[in-house]
Amino acid sequence: MDGKTILPRSEVPEEFTWDLSHVFASDDKWNEELEALKAYPERMAAYAGKLGESAKTLLDWFTLSDEINVRVSKFVQYASCRSDQDVGNSFYQGMRSKAFSTAVALNSAGSFEASEIMAIPDETLARFYAEEPKLETYRRSIDKLRRRKAHILSPECEKILAAAGEISESPDRTFSMFHNADMRYPDVTDAKGEVHTLTDGTFVPMLMSADRTLRENAFKAYYKRAGEFRNTYASTLDAQFKQLKFFADARRYNSTLEASLDVTEVPVEVYTNLIDAVHGNLDKMYRYVELRKKILGVDELHMYDVYTPIVADADVEISFEEAKKTALEALAVLGKDYTDVLEEAFSNRWLDVYENTGKRGGAYCTGNGWPHPYVLLNHKDNLDSMFTLVHEMGHAMHTWHSCKYQPVNTAEYVIFVAEVASTCNEILLMRHLLGKTDDRKQRAYLINHFLDQFKGTLYRQTMFAEFELQMGKMAESGEALTTDALSAKYLALNKLYFGDTMISDDEIALEWTRIPHFYYNYYVFQYATSFSAAVAIANRILREGESAVKDYKKFLSGGCSKEPVELLRDMGVDMRTPAPVNDALSLFGELIDELSALLG
C-alpha cells in the first residue's frame, strides 16, 4: 500500500492500522469498563468535605485519583482512536461521546478536590507530610493547586464549571465533524488535464506539486468551497472564544490568554515576547520569500507557490518502510534504549499509517502512555511525511518516558514542552540527511525543506498565535467573530508576515477556516517556542554527545515534575528570554545564505 490510494477503512491492510486491543481487547470490553467506571462517583463522594481531616484520608484520595486517571485515560484513548479512524462511523462517534461524558462526570464528581486542598492550613499540610511520607509523591500536584488559589471557586461553583466542560468541547467537535466528515471538495485538474481528488488530506500535497496549474486549481477550489461555508466556520470559532472567555471570567483572570497559560505555569510574557522577537526578524522571512521568487522564476509569487520545493524534481518517493529505517538511523544518536522502543512501536502497531475515507486529517500522538501512546498519521510517501513520522514519534517517546519514570500525578507533561521532543527529532533527522549528501541539488532541496520548517513552524505558528491573540481580544471586548472581521485580520497578518514580494491572494483570507489548532486554547505558539528550544537542544546533542543525551532523557522523563520553563532551563534553554528565538532565526538567515550560494 502507498499514500496515493484512499481506501475505505475496512479495506486498509491490518499492518498499517493501530492495534487498539492493547488497551481493550474488544468494544465489548470497553463497554464493560464503561459500566465499571460508573461506580467511581459514589466512592469519590465519600471523600467530599474530608480531604483536610487527616494525612491518610488525603493520601487515600490521591491514590484513588491515580487509579481513576489511568483507567479514564485508557477509556477515552480507545474511544477517540476508534472515532478518529473513521469520523463518519456513527457507532464510534457515539462511543466517543460516551467516553467524554463519562470523563466529565468523573471530573465533576471530584470537583471538590481543588477547593478543599486550598482550604488546608499551611501548618496542617506540613504536619500531613511529616505523618505520611508517601504524600511527598503528591507535593508537586498540591503546590500547583494551591498556587492558583485566587482562581479556584467554591465547591458548588467548581462542580458547575466541571459539568460545563462537555459543553466547552462542542465548538471543536462541531468543527471536526463538519470539516473532516461532511466537507467535500470538487475534483481538480493539472496542466495535462488529468483529474485529481481534492480532500483536506490531499490539499497540501497538491500545493507541493511542481505542476503550478494543479497548485493554483487546488488552492482556488479548496477556498472557494470553504467560502461557501464561511459563516459556519466563523460561528464555531466565535463559540470557541466565547467559551474561553466564560471560563476565564469565571475564574477571575484578566484575559483568556492568561487563563490558558496559568494552568501550565507559563508566563504571559513568553507568548508576547515570541511575537515581538519574530516581528524583529521578519526581514529574514522577506529575504526567503524573495529568494523563493527568484529561484522559481515567476513574475509573481502567490500563496499557492509557498509549499512547492524550490529545487525541481529533487524530492523522491519515500515509502513508509524507508521512512522508518531512516528515522531509526537519524535517532540512533539518542541511544539504543531509545531506538529499541521505536522499533517496538513500529512492529507492535502503535501507529495508524495511511489516510482512509473519513479518517481524521493531519497527525497526532495520544497523550496517554498506559500501556503506550498511539500515533495517527496520513502518510503520503514523501519527505514531509517522513518528518511527520519522526515528529509524532518524538511525542510518543516523550509520553512513554514520562509515563514510565514519573508517578501518575506528574506523568502528563504540559503543552509548553509538548512540542520540544517532536521538533528535536525533526532537526536531528534534517542534520542526518544533510550529513549524508554532498550533492548540491539534494543538499539545496534539504536546506530548502529546513527553511520551510522555520517558515512553517516558527514564523507561521507565530502568525497563528498572533491571530489567536486577536480573536481572544475580540471576544473579551464583546466583538463578534464574524467572517468579515476574521478574514480582514487574517489577511492583514498574512501580508505582514510574508511581505510585499508575496501576493497575498484573496483566498488566503479564509485560511483560518482550516486550522484545527484554533480550537486548542492558545496551543500553536508552543510550536514556535518549542522549535526554538529544539534547535538549541539538537545542537547540544550533536555537539556534546552522551552528556547531552543523558540530560535530554531526564527532560523526556520529567513529565510535569517541574515548571516547564525550569525543565528547559535544565537543558540550558531559557525561554523567558528572547535569546532562543533570536538564535534560531539567526540560523534561518545563515541557511538562506547557504541556499542562495548553492543555487547561484
Predicted features along the sequence, with ranges:
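Catalytic zinc-binding patch centered on the HExxH motif and its immediate surroundings
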Residues: 316-318, 351-371
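A well-structured
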Residues: 1-313, 598-600
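Long, K/E/R/D-enriched contiguous segments that form extended
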Residues: 295-339, 398, 445, 451-457, ...
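C-terminal, non-catalytic "cap/extension" segments appended to globular domains
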Residues: 10-14, 21, 25, 113, ...
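Active-site recognition of the HExxH zinc-binding catalytic motif
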Residues: 252, 380-400, 422, 427, ...
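Short pre-active-site segment immediately N-terminal to the catalytic Zn-binding motif
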Residues: 316-318, 368-390
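Conserved helix-loop functional segments at active or binding sites
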Residues: 329, 333-340, 366, 395, ...
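Post-HExxH zinc-binding segment in Zn-dependent metallohydrolases
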Residues: 413-442, 450-452, 456, 530
